[in-house]
């Protein structure tokens, strides 16, 4: 498997910095994965890659508003006020200081794009696992990245 590219720290002299989010998809059967795509002094962009029956655990960003956009799969965002289910292309704003979590109760892998301002201290490009996330047993089928990419981009399902 190819290595993920290093996260992008945009040079100050560039006004536009393109990235291919597919290069940052990183699932784990052990825990939900958060991958930092890029960071500036004012904004961070992360991908959450969450297998079925996994969750992020409790998240809270005391100094940052965070927007979440579901790219693939079906998500449940859980807060103290209740739950919100989002399908692909659904988005949610979570204000600073609100405790929340992302739960994948579906049968498909879940990919969520998170934009945070100002950014937290996550080391760039380091997936972060949550030990409280559920573990998905290995069923011997196609790998999670193959399944997610096939569902997101079309093509033959179940191929590696």
Regions found by a protein language model. Give the residues of each.
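A short hydrophobic beta-strand segment most commonly corresponding to one strand
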Residues: 108-125
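A short, N-terminal "cap"/entry segment at the start of jelly-roll beta-barrel domains
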Residues: 1-46, 57-58, 127-160
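Structural motif
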Residues: 74-76, 83, 99, 109
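Short beta-strand His + acidic residue motifs that chelate non-heme Fe in jelly-roll/DSBH
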Residues: 57-58, 77-78, 94, 100-106
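Short, charged/polar surface micro-motifs in flexible loops or helix N-caps
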Residues: 41-44, 51-55, 74, 118-122
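Short, conserved beta-strand element in jelly-roll/cupin
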Residues: 49-51, 60-77, 115
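Short acidic-glycine-tyrosine-enriched beta hairpin
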Residues: 81-96
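Short, surface-exposed secondary-structure boundary micro-motifs
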Residues: 97-98, 117
């Amino acid at each position: 498997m190819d290595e993920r590219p290093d996260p992008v720290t945009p040079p100050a002299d560039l006004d536009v910095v393109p990235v291919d989010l597919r290069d940052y998809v990183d699932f784990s059967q052990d825990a939900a994965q958060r991958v930092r795509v890029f960071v500036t002094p004012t904004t961070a962009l992360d991908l959450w890659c969450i297998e079925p029956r996994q969750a992020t655990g409790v998240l809270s960003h005391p100094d940052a508003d965070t927007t979440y956009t579901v790219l693939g799969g079906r998500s449940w965002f859980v807060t103290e006020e209740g739950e919100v289910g989002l399908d692909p292309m659904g988005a949610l704003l979570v204000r600073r200081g609100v405790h929340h979590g992302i739960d994948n109760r579906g049968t498909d892998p879940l990919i969520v794009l998170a934009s945070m301002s100002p950014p937290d201290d996550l080391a760039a490009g380091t997936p972060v696992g949550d030990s409280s996330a559920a573990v998905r047993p290995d069923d011997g089928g196609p790998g999670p990245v193959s399944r997610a990419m096939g569902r997101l981009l079309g093509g033959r399902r179940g191929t590696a």
